[in-house]
Amino acid sequence: MTDPALIDELKTLVEPGKVLTDADSLNAYGKDWTKHFAPAPSAIVFPKSIEQVQAIVRWANAHKVALVPSGGRTGLSAAAVAANGEVVVSFDYMNQILEFNEMDRTAVCQPGVVTAQLQQFAEDKGLYYPVDFASAGSSQIGGNIGTNAGGIKVIRYGMTRNWVAGMKVVTGKGDLLELNKDLIKNATGYDLRQLFIGAEGTLGFVVEATMRLERQPTNLTALVLGTPDFDSIMPVLHAFQDKLDLTAFEFFSDKALAKVLGRGDVPAPFETDCPFYALLEFEATTEERAEQALATFEHCVEQGWVLDGVMSQSEQQLQNLWKLREYISETISHWTPYKNDISVTVGKVPAFLKEIDAIVGEHYPDFEIVWFGHIGDGNLHLNILKPDAMDKDEFFGKCATVNKWVFETVQKYNGSISAEHGVGMTKRDYLEYSRSPAEIEYMKAVKAVFDPNGIMNPGKIFAA
């Protein structure tokens, strides 16, 4: 869509200066963190109200113009990429927390509220927003809802879906729907709210969301444990889960740790070299809980599941231990990683990881593989690092070949090709490995109801 007359008409729907067509803006707002697709939007529009969003959607319907939602653009599946002349709808100016309800522990947010902004707001109120991940400083609530974002606390607090009390959406027809009205109990038929969570903007745009908040955790304490092999991580998880209510249980490989330590600004947890590491967190609200954690650690050492470990003794040490895990994605970005975000049920994780690791190692022995993830909920992040001497297109082509084998294994284990990053365009052609043909047809039928003209983020989840 490059018709200047249509762009001029679009400009009348928003405030002056809130439609951009310069090359820098098109490049910046037409992409997310994926590097697989060249951005090529026609324009970027910045609404400041629900009414303006409705007007934009109705304009797009009238002229059959495709729209792509844009939040913090931190996604890893190209769900926010505009590569085919679409108009990008950025929610940067709809960024306010509109209301706080102390009794209900809820905050009413516009879609452009940054995740860390909501976290800080909750903290200022003596509360806690628990959905957390490395991109919290720039990701936006609308995007979190669009991908049903997970992160590092899912084992205790669940996904974004669990924290949406209600929301307002503008459908692909331009209708405004208020979903669930912030109720805890609402047994009145279909919960349409759940359809829009994880829909990646393909049904409509979230324009307001009421987010639930939680009590603040107290005296959070972390342990980093080194294990002799991956199989040992699972009994460690079970041992600690039997004794403590964990708030997190993460894992990473020795190669992941080496990359982070290579930065020079993060201390090693201990001197012993181990092939795999687990990071777990719990609330040490009493001295007995801390003692129980130490006793469980000693038990794991006696069983041969743990070679070495350390437990945080201060807030600073807690932060340093978390940096070992949280800095991985940022650190390996230098190597243009090809990322897979896959999941199986927790009990299948060891056999699944071994099989995937063997597949990649057999076919591409020269590729460096970095594993990490949220082992407590069965979510593994497989990262294949690009050799410095290899062209990016050649590298991505080889990785795409690996994908088929990886996803066939995911299907074999009844897993998901996308645990928390969404489908977007990067996983679109592999959806059949996680969803049956009947499911996909019903999903397309749902989209047709809310977006009959196919203007809402077309080409994401399934082909346009």
UniProtKB/Swiss-Prot annotation:
Domain of life where this protein originates: Bacteria
Loss of function: phenotype: The deletion mutant is barely able to use D-2-HG for growth and displays a relatively slower growth in a medium containing glucose. Cells lacking this gene also show high accumulation of extracellular and intracellular D-2-HG. Moreover, the mutant strain loses the ability to utilize D-malate for growth.
Conditions for induction: Expression is up-regulated by exogenously added D-2-hydroxyglutarate or D-malate.
Residues holding (R)-malate: 325, 329, 339, 421
SUPFAM superfamilies cross-referenced by the UniProt entry: FAD-binding/transporter-associated domain-like, FAD-linked oxidases, C-terminal domain
Mechanisms controlling activity: Activated by Zn(2+) ions at low concentrations (10 uM) and inhibited by Zn(2+), Fe(2+) and Ni(2+) at high concentrations (10 mM).
Catalytic activity from the UniProt record: (R)-2-hydroxyglutarate + A = 2-oxoglutarate + AH2; (R)-malate + A = oxaloacetate + AH2
Residue ranges constituting the FAD-binding PCMH-type domain according to the UniProt record: 37-216
Cofactor binding summary note: Binds 1 FAD per subunit.
Keywords: FAD, Flavoprotein, Metal-binding, Oxidoreductase, Zinc
Chain sites annotated for binding (R)-2-hydroxyglutarate: 325, 329, 339, 383, 421
EC number(s) from the headed UniProt entry: 1.1.99.39, 1.1.99.-
Keyword Flavoprotein (UniProt): yes
Task performed by this protein: Catalyzes the dehydrogenation of (R)-2-hydroxyglutarate (D-2-hydroxyglutarate or D-2-HG) to 2-oxoglutarate and of (R)-malate (D-malate) to oxaloacetate. Is functionally tied to L-serine biosynthesis, via its coupling with the D-3-phosphoglycerate dehydrogenase SerA, encoded by the adjacent gene in the locus. Is required for the utilization of D-2-hydroxyglutarate as well as D-malate as the sole carbon source for growth of P.stutzeri.
Sequence similarity: Belongs to the FAD-binding oxidoreductase/transferase type 4 family.
The name this protein goes by in its record: D-2-hydroxyglutarate dehydrogenase
